[in-house]
Each structure stands twice: as C-alpha cells, then as structure tokens.
Amino acid sequence: MANNPPQSSGTQFRPMVPGQQGQHFVPAASQPFHPYGHVPPNVQSQPPQYSQPIQQQQLFPVRPGQPVHITSSSQAVSVPYIQTNKILTSGSTQPQPNAPPMTGFATSGPPFSSPYTFVPSSYPQQQPTSLVQPNSQMHVAGVPPAANTWPVPVNQSTSLVSPVQQTGQQTPVAVSTDPGNLTPQSASDWQEHTSADGRKYYYNKRTKQSNWEKPLELMTPLERADASTVWKEFTTPEGKKYYYNKVTKESKWTIPEDLKLAREQAQLASEKTSLSEAGSTPLSHHAASSSDLAVSTVTSVVPSTSSALTGHSSSPIQAGLAVPVTRPPSVAPVTPTSGAISDTEATTIKGDNLSSRGADDSNDGATAQNNEAENKEMSVNGKANLSPAGDKANVEEPMVYATKQEAKAAFKSLLESVNVHSDWTWEQTLKEIVHDKRYGALRTLGERKQAFNEYLGQRKKVEAEERRRRQKKAREEFVKMLEECEELSSSLKWSKAMSLFENDQRFKAVDRPRDREDLFDNYIVELERKEREKAAEEHRQYMADYRKFLETCDYIKAGTQWRKIQDRLEDDDRCSCLEKIDRLIGFEEYILDLEKEEEELKRVEKEHVRRAERKNRDAFRTLLEEHVAAGILTAKTYWLDYCIELKDLPQYQAVASNTSGSTPKDLFEDVTEELEKQYHEDKSYVKDAMKSRKISMVSSWLFEDFKSAISEDLSTQQISDINLKLIYDDLVGRVKEKEEKEARKLQRLAEEFTNLLHTFKEITVASNWEDSKQLVEESQEYRSIGDESVSQGLFEEYITSLQEKAKEKERKRDEEKVRKEKERDEKEKRKDKDKERREKEREREKEKGKERSKREESDGETAMDVSEGHKDEKRKGKDRDRKHRRRHHNNSDEDVSSDRDDRDESKKSSRKHGNDRKKSRKHANSPESESENRHKRQKKESSRRSGNDELEDGEVGE
C-alpha cells in the first residue's frame, strides 16, 4: 500500500487491508509482516536497529475530520496507527552492543544494551516513508486486524520506533520530530506564479501540474481552518466582510460558529504546538548520547496541527503509550500510576483502550469537551486496564465497511437497536453501546458524536412526526364525535359541551383542555357558517320567486314608485316570506333591470339617429367639394360669408339639425384647412420661382401681367387659376402695403424734422436754408432723411408756414382789437343806461326823503350835504380805479390770447400730416373751437366787469 500514489482529498473512508506477506527484513532472516493486532507466537527475535528513526514518511492524505494529537513526555497519548508493509531499505539490523546507552529516560537497574541505532534523516521528502520493522512480527494489543486507520495530517512528520521485546513481540511507536510536511508533495514543490490577467496560480515542479487554488502545503494554519469549512470569507467594496456558504448558497454578515470555532482551534493548536516543541527534547539527541536503552516505555510526541483537508484542529491530549519491553532476567510487570513509568516493569494498554483513544478530536471542533468525553469513555471501558506484557488480549474483530456512509449507518443502527431516545445524553448512550462491535465502525470520538447527534435529530423528527400524526388522528376523532352529536348546535356553550362529552374516550384522547376548546370553537364556527349558507340559499330562493312575481305584474313600469304599489304586493304569499327591506331591495333591482332595458332601446334608437346624421354630414361634404371645384370655396373664404350662401340649401339644413357630431362650420374648417395647405405650397413655389428668375412684383401689374411673367414656371407645377389669383392678390397687397409703409415712414421723418425746426428759436420768418443748414445737419432727424433736397423742401414749407402764421396772427390781433373796442363801447353804453336808471331811482328816493323830513329840514339839509359830498368823492375814486384795471386787463388778455394762438398754430402745423388721432387733435384746435373758446373768455370777462360795476355802484359790496 505504501507504493501506491496518495489518494485524493475527496476520499472519506478507506478500509485497511492486511499488509502483503513475504516482504522480509534485510539482511537478517525475518518473519512475514502481519497487521496490527495479530497475536504471533512467542519467538526469539534478533534485536533490530533503526536505520532512519526520524525519516519523513510518505503517507496517505488525511480523511476530513481526522483528529491530530500532541503528546508531552510526561503523559501518554493515543496516536493514529499507520499500517504499512514498507520494509526497511537501509541500515543494519544487527545489534550494536557497544552503542552508548540512552539518557533522559527513567530507568532502574543496569542499562539495556541499545537494540536500535538512530540515524538522522538525510533523505529528501519525496522518498517513501521508512518505517522500522523488526525481524519479528509486530503486535499492539487491542488493535484488530484490518482496522480502519487514518493517516497523519500532511504537515506532520513522524517516525515509528519499535523497542525490542525479548519475548519476540514488538510494537511500533510514533516518535515526534519537528512538525513538517508529510504529504507526498512538500511545500517546496509548489511555485507561485501570476497570469497575464493578474490572477495567481500554483505550479508543482514534481507533478508538472498547475492549479488556480492555493495548495494546502502553502496554506497557513488559519487558511487551512477556513478551507476545512463550507464557508468562505469575502469583502465588500466598502470594506465590510461577509461570509458565503458554498453548499447552501447562504450569505451572512456575522462569522459562522463553525468557521469561528475552526479558527480558534487552529490558533490554539498552533500555540500549544510551539509550547510542546519548546518543552520536549528531540529523540535523536537521546539516541546519540546513550548506548543502552534503559527504558520501559518510549514516549511518542505527536504535534497536533490542523487537518489538511478539513481544517479542524484539536486540543492536544497527552497520554502515555506503554510498550512492553523485556530484558534478562525476567522482571515482573508493574502497573504505573498517573503516567509514571516503572524502572523495571513494562506495561501494556488494553486493546479497547487503544481503540477508544485512537483519536480524540471530533469534526465539530470540540476540544476540552472531547477530552472529558474520552476520559469518560475510558472509564466505561475499564479505566485503562493494564495487563502484564505476556498476556494476550482476546479482541473481537470489528466489521469492515466499504465506505464511510456504511460505517455511519452501522453506528446508527447500533443506536437504534439500543433504542436510544431523543433526550438521551452521550454519556448515557455510551454505557449501552460501548461493548458492541459496531461501536468501532467509526474510529474517532468526533465521528461517533456527529453520528449520535444526527441520530438524535432524526429520532426527534420521527417522534415529532409520530406525535403529530397521533394528535391529528385524535383531533379528527374529536371532530367526528362532535359531528355525531345531535344535541350540538351553534348556540351551545363549551361548559355545557364538556358535560356531554366528558365520558367519551375520543374527548379524552385530546390531552390539552385548551386544544379541546379550540377544536370545539372551530367546529362551532364552521357550524355557524353552514347554517348561514343554508339560510342564504333559502333567501336566494325566496328572492327568485319574488322576482318572478314582479315580472308578472304588468302595472310595474320603469318609473313606478315603491310607495304607490307596496300595498298591492303584500297580498301575495310570495311576498310574505320576505322581510320588508328584502321586498324593497328586490323591487329596486327589478326597476333597475327595466331601466336597463329602456336604456338599451334608447341606445338602439340613438344608433339609428347617429347613422342618419352621418349620412347628412357625408352629403354636406359632397356639396363642399362641388363648391371647391367651382371656385366658390377657396382658401381665403370666410365662414360668415359662405354661410349666407348655404343657409337655404337642404344639405346645410340637414347637418344643422344634427344633435351630435360635427357641425357645418367644423366640416367647412376641415375643407378650408386642406385648401390653405395647398395654397401655401403653391405660394412657396411661386415665390421661389420669382426669386430664382429675379422677378420683382410691381403694384401696377394686372393678373394677366403676373401670369405671363411666371408662365414658364407654371408648366412644371400644376397650379389652379383660383390659387394663382389668390397668390397674385396677396403679392400685390404686400407690395402696396410696403409702399404705404415707406410713405408713412417718410411722413414720420418729415414730421420729426419739422418738429426739430420748431425747437430752434434762431429760425424765423426771415431765415433761409443756407444759414439754417448748419443748425440741423448734425441731428439724427436730418441724417435719417438722407436727401438734402427733401430736407430743404421741408425747411421751406416750415418757413412758409411761419409766414402764414405771422399773417394770421396779425389778422387775428386786429380783429380781436376791433372786437374788444366794440365790446367796450357797448359796455359803456350799457353802463350809462344803468347809471341814468340809478340816478332816476335816487331822485325818486330823494323826493320821498324830502317829504318825510320836512320837519327836520334844517338838520337834514346839513347831514345830506355832508353825505352827498362824501359819496360823490368815493364814486369818483372808484371810477378811476375801474378804468385803470380795465385797461391793464385788456392788455394782458391780448398778450395771453396771442401767445395761445401761436402755440395752437405751431401744434397744428406739426400735426398737419398725422394719423386719425392727430387729426382729431387738429380738429380740436380748429378755428371753430377757437371761436368757441374766445366766446367763453369774453363771457367770463363781461361777467367779471358786471360784477365790478355792481361793486362800484356801491350799495351791495360796501
């Protein structure tokens, strides 16, 4: 088996077979090799010697979950045995009596002659494993033939040491060396490279193979721990870590328990390995300094590391492995205590103890708990019974299983045969199964616990299913009991129902009272639902009969009211079965159906009307098309004008009488829209033709002139005479409008220039163009005209208007003066008349006063003389003041009126050529309005003068 290539990491279970027979130790005559556990006869064997005690071994890959153990020099350890038929290929097997004795071991009595020679390892890692094989058959008590064995992890280097048994039996013992790589491919065989796209890959120099995945040999203990689980760690772009399960496709933010446990165990194993290496002495050092082997046991130190395939690491469990050693004379065996080994006695470990302690690390990563469980298991097996070296262990051979699944199934069948319950603990189960041969189907405690936990989970599921099925059946029987009870109704209470069913076994089959009540409540709810459904069905039948009755009543129409016929309906038996509200609802539903029928009839009638209206619209469209062909309807036709011509036609009247759809105006606009579109296309073509041939439109052209000018272009484009006439009218209108616009612009410039001339006081009636040109030639108005002759003509017109204004002003001043003189004379005449009248009145008053004052003539005459003199003086002064004010007022009126006339004349001349608004202003300033204003002023003056006269005459104002 050692010559075969290493198995793949996917192999989970591999049965061991007995080693090949016929391979003998070289050069001495040795007996054939037998598997561990075989009890050979006592034969005298020559003392072998080690050829390569620390040679690195080439082993099979470690099965996932294979535990690895560390031992110290003071405690025993159970190590995984490695079965191989590899024989020693180098070194001498002859004894060396002159070799120095070994030191560092606890011995008593004379030292043994060393039967072994320790040779340092000098072979490369690629060479096959060299195990020390004595010339006699090796035997380990308690290890059955073809037992399931697992190899040591890939990063562990061990050598097997077999001390001599004088009785002819030897036991291979694993001796610890520095931790190394025990895999067929060492870390030095792998090289890391980087591909063109930046990805890293690994190349094996020995196998000439490349791999994208990082080999186990190059992994750190932490990476091996991660690789042993189904979880893989990733990092988001934000730097947050999450974990992905490769089996269940599950992602989570928190670190899974198994991954966390694997990392902790890897860290713990690494720390304890370093401590173990620091506290132990290499075995080669003792071999070099000692010539006699004076030990009764050889302690194996196996550093624990992470499993190469599963990544699970275990806590170091230290135990002493006792190897029987005999020397003459015979020494009675002594049982050691607390790991201490006697000087002269050899101890052996019972086969069950070795079997149960072959590996103590479980797949779930338990460390200290596994140690405690293993100690309990050892106590169950007999508390590590030790027997004399000469006793032969009667070991029952375990069954061999082809696969790991079969072994696990056998172990589960053992649990099932013992009838392990789902609430049993491992310690409780261990007492029942430890003596069964199927207990050894799984080698490690972790595998057994894993299978035990799986069995408990399955057992719990089975028990839960059985419990659920039993409860389901009890519930069904309970419901059946309720259905069979005739006294049960929807109004029955639970308290009364309990008294009815308390003696029934089906009632007692449901354990929990709460469940019984829930089942009862559910049944009552279902019973109520059925009763409601039955009542609803009866109600539907009554409503159907009532509906048939309503349909037979001919006096019910769509507009019939309920209040008028409800008394007539109540006499029928089909109405008495229903409530009043139900009868009302049924009546309303029937009325709604009648209304729907009427609406359907209306819809059909409306459809007929719609078709007739559509025919009317089609006839009107035909009429419009005829008018378009005749030229009556064009793109420039307005609806109001066209409607006057159509209003008496039957097609128009038919469409106008339509109640829906397009109106006659809508149809007219649809046609004119198409005509306008064609008109604009023809107009664009004509304008492009005129532009290409450089034809300028003249406002004096007739239609024939325009048509002849573009006749050559009309041969390529068919344009109707109607559209061509419309195009002509539009172009001529545009030309005329442009000319009018230019004329208005020139008139505006002339007005602006004339207004500019008004602003210069230097320009008078006597000014000429040559002298005044320098005043206006820098202005914007003058430059806007651009033609000096036009500006000069406007200037001369302005001078002429000034001359006319001056003449008119002089004439008006003369007329005003004559008028005022005439008014003054008339006013004097009126004043004289008034004065004479007042004199006469005074005379009459005087006469009356004379008659009254005859008796006081003397006194009265004196008083009258004084009074009359004073009044005469006062009247004379007032006459002088009035004349002075009148002269001053007349002069100021003449000046104001002349200035106002000048301003009016200037405004009239500046707005002589304006628009309607300017004309209206001109009209407001016409001579007629001036005469009216003058009349108003004269009236005011006359009233003012008359008021002054009244004040002068004295009696009122004074």
From Swiss-Prot:
Domain WW: 184-217, 225-258
Gene3D superfamilies the UniProt entry points to: 2.20.70.10, FF domain
Tissue: Highly expressed in roots. Expressed in shoots, rosette leaves, cauline leaves, stems and flowers.
Region ranges (Disordered): 1-54, 89-132, 158-193, 270-292, 328-391, 805-958
Disruption phenotype: No visible phenotype, probably due to the redundancy with PRP40B and PRP40C.
Biased composition (Polar residues): 1-12, 110-132, 158-189, 270-283, 335-347
Compartments (UniProt record): Nucleus
Stretches assigned to coiled coil: none
Protein's name in the database: Pre-mRNA-processing protein 40A
Upper lineage: Eukaryota, Viridiplantae, Streptophyta, Embryophyta, Tracheophyta
